[in-house]
Amino acid sequence: MKKILVAEDNDSNYILMTYVLKGSYEFDRARNGKEAVEMVDRSGYHLVLMDLKMPVMDGLTATAIIKERHPQLPVVALTANVFDIDKQQAVDAGCVAFLAKPVKLQNCMETIKKYIL
């Protein structure tokens, strides 16, 4: 089974993501960007779902570090900020896709399937 890291500090958003992933993927949770970087370094994930606004280390910084160390690992941005500048910052950090919150379940599944073969 493919393994996904969900980097999300908000409990409600994490519960929604577990609903999407349960049964199809193994998944772990990181509650901040620093934890996400550490977990990616220790485990073999196939994809990261990255909240961009988190404590300790934001998702953009965490994504840039992850992509530097693991360039082939797809990182998908999750954020309530949907302005063009936010999307561009996510791309610049290394995100391969951008999902706006609240996340639509079908869009999320399609995006995951696109990057996990």
How does the language model describe each region?
Residues 10-28:
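Two-component/phosphorelay signaling modules centered on CheY-like receiver
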Residues 103-112:
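C-terminal output helix
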Residues 29-47, 68, 88:
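Acidic, metal-coordinating helix/loop segments flanking the phosphotransfer/catalytic sites
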Residues 25, 41-43, 65-73, 93:
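Conserved phosphotransfer cores of two-component systems
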